[in-house]
Amino acid sequence: MAVLKWKQHRFSTSDDTVSATQLVKQLQHTPSPYSSTVSVGTAKTYGQTSAATRPGHCGLAEKQHCGPVNPLLGAATPTGNNKRRKLCSGNTTPIIHLKGDRNSLKCLRYRLRKHSDHYRDISSTWHWTGAGNEKTGILTVTYHSETQRTKFLNTVAIPDSVQILVGYMTM
């Protein structure tokens, strides 16, 4: 009878020994499709909280946590009243995408330097790959708050040839 030895580097510094027959019996057991792990070896418990009570990034338990947010509910506008979006927006930031001719966007980005106090960051010109308009580019502008974004849109002159897309981005 063969004996298998391994070391669990993460949780223990001691060796666990399991016989080959015990190992085969445990591996032959077919777990249910909803089982997340199959344990082989000695039973150990670790001080982990269940997924149902583990807090999400915004302090809610996973069962209470927000699902996908529907942008049609008004969260994409500064006057939106989607409370779920605001509650779970710990790592989201207000943004706008400026969409238009690549060269025009490049020139616009350089002109926006003088308004740097009205935004947080601005990306270089980028584009989606795949089927689409190869001459269209996008600039992403991020803000510290919705108020700053509103002030930017009211202050800065954006050319009519550039489309403005307002939204949020998870950082």
Curated annotation (Swiss-Prot):
The keyword Lyase is annotated on this UniProt entry? no
Task: List UniProt keywords, sorted A-Z.
Answer: Host nucleus
Name a GO CC annotation attached to this entry: host cell nucleus
- Spell out the subcellular localization from the entry: Host nucleus
Q: Which SUPFAM superfamilies does the record associate with it?
A: Viral DNA-binding domain
User: What Gene Ontology molecular function terms does this protein carry?
Assistant: DNA binding; DNA-binding transcription factor activity
Gene Ontology BP term (one): regulation of DNA replication
Domain of life, per UniProt, equals Viruses
Write out the similarity annotation: Belongs to the papillomaviridae E8^E2C protein family.
The function of this protein is:
Plays a role in limiting the replication of viral DNA in keratinocytes. Recruits the host NCoR/SMRT complex to viral replication foci to mediate repression of both viral replication and transcription.
The name under which this protein is listed is Protein E8^E2C
State the species of origin: Human papillomavirus type 18
